[in-house]
């Protein structure tokens, strides 16, 4: 793509224990920029195991299906009646091994969800709860979608105290 990009990301911990991530980018030519992060959270803490018991709610009644290679098809599909439906809180692992074609293509959840009634203002779009710790994480965005990735392709990695992390 044309141009040079200077990007900055600032991570802040607020007084009320919120993680605030702000992105800023400038270019010297018109170009495409898609800033993101790949932070992964297990709200039950170090060595707690899988996130499959975590409960997830998304403000999204539609998602964007993918083809082989996880490339979006351009379709916007309703989640109702599918394992992609998190419009009511449910455990991440409840349907993750379902034979639904979208889960089979990606080995689990790795999809963009379309935010309901998006208007560009900062809105609460997701809540995740860790059952063992009781910790709750809420996500807010001004953007029209959110990618939910359940770590399907994270290779097992050694961690602190001999604990392994990954799928």
Question: How should these model regions be labeled?
Answer:
Residues 1-167:
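An exposed, glycine/acidic-rich loop-and-rim segment of catalytic or binding clefts
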């Amino acid at each position: 793509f044309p141009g040079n990009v200077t990007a900055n990301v600032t991570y802040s911990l607020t007084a009320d224990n919120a993680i605030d991530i702000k992105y800023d980018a400038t270019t010297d030519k018109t170009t495409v920029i898609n800033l993101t992060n790949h932070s992964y959270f297990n709200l039950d803490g170090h060595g707690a195991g899988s996130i499959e018991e975590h409960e997830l709610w998304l403000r999204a009644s539609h998602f964007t299906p993918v083809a082989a290679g996880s490339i979006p098809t351009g379709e916007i599909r309703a989640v109702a009646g599918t394992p992609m439906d998190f419009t009511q809180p449910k455990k991440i692992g409840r349907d993750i091994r379902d034979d639904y074609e979208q889960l089979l293509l990606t080995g689990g959840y790795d999809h963009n969800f379309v935010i309901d009634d998006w208007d560009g203002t900062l809105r609460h779009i997701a809540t995740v709860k860790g059952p063992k710790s009781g910790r709750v994480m809420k996500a807010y965005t001004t953007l029209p979608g959110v990618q939910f990735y359940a770590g399907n392709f994270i290779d097992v990695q050694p961690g602190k105290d001999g604990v392994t992390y990954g799928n």
